[in-house]
């Protein structure tokens, strides 16, 4: 294999790695956003549950208002 062919193969590998890495990063951004939404929903439900119980709402006036 000549030097030009080896250099071309190297560039193809670098390009393929970059494309796969970029696509993987974008996909994980979506999963991270979904996990964050799910966590905030869980926190909201927990706060709502606490605020509906008198003892919990008295102990946490900053959360329950």
From Swiss-Prot:
The modification Cysteine amide is found at residue 64. Its main location: secreted. GO terms for molecular function: acetylcholine receptor inhibitor activity; ion channel regulator activity; toxin activity. The keyword Signal applies. Pfam families: Toxin_8. It is found in: Secreted. Residues 1-21 form the signal peptide. The keyword Disulfide bond applies. InterPro entries: Conotoxin_a-typ. Disulfide bonds join 50-56, 51-64. Keywords: Acetylcholine receptor inhibiting toxin, Amidation, Disulfide bond, Ion channel impairing toxin, Neurotoxin, Postsynaptic neurotoxin, Secreted, Signal, Toxin. It comes from the Eukaryota. Residues 52-54 are annotated as: Ser-Xaa-Pro motif, crucial for potent interaction with nAChR. Expressed by the venom duct. The cysteine framework is I (CC-C-C). Alpha4/7 pattern. Belongs to the conotoxin A superfamily. This is Alpha-conotoxin BnIA.
């Amino acid at each position: 294999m000549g030097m030009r062919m080896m250099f071309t193969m190297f560039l193809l590998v670098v390009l393929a790695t970059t494309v796969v890495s970029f696509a993987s990063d974008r996909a994980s951004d979506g999963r991270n956003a979904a996990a964050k939404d799910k966590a905030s929903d869980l926190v909201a439900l927990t706060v709502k549950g606490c605020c509906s119980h008198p003892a919990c709402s008295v102990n946490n006036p900053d959360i329950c208002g």
